[in-house]
């Protein structure tokens, strides 16, 4: 899965963001499992990018929640 930028994420609906969040969390879990088994991941920067994208999604979801509550 390609890493999504903030402007791409802001164009998505809340449901799409939730789906991407679940998908990325699964991918991160797989990466962590492969790291635990194999020792060194095949792409060490991938875990960092997944974590950062998850943080972006959560930030944008919170922004959208705040905008609807105002």
UniProtKB/Swiss-Prot annotation:
GO molecular function, one term: structural constituent of ribosome
Biological processes annotated in GO: translation
Keyword tags: Ribonucleoprotein, Ribosomal protein
Pfam families membership: Ribosomal_L29
Highest taxon of the lineage: Archaea
This protein's record includes keyword Ribonucleoprotein: yes
Family: Belongs to the universal ribosomal protein uL29 family.
Name of this chain's protein: Large ribosomal subunit protein uL29
Organism lineage: Archaea, Methanobacteriati, Methanobacteriota, Methanomada group, Methanococci
Gene it is expressed from: rpl29
């Amino acid at each position: 899965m390609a890493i999504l930028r903030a402007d791409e994420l802001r164009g998505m609906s809340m449901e799409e963001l939730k789906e991407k969040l679940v998908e990325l969390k699964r991918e991160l879990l797989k990466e962590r499992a492969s790291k635990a088994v194999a020792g060194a991941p095949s792409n060490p920067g991938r875990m960092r990018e997944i974590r950062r994208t998850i943080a972006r999604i959560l930030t944008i979801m919170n922004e959208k929640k705040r905008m609807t509550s105002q």
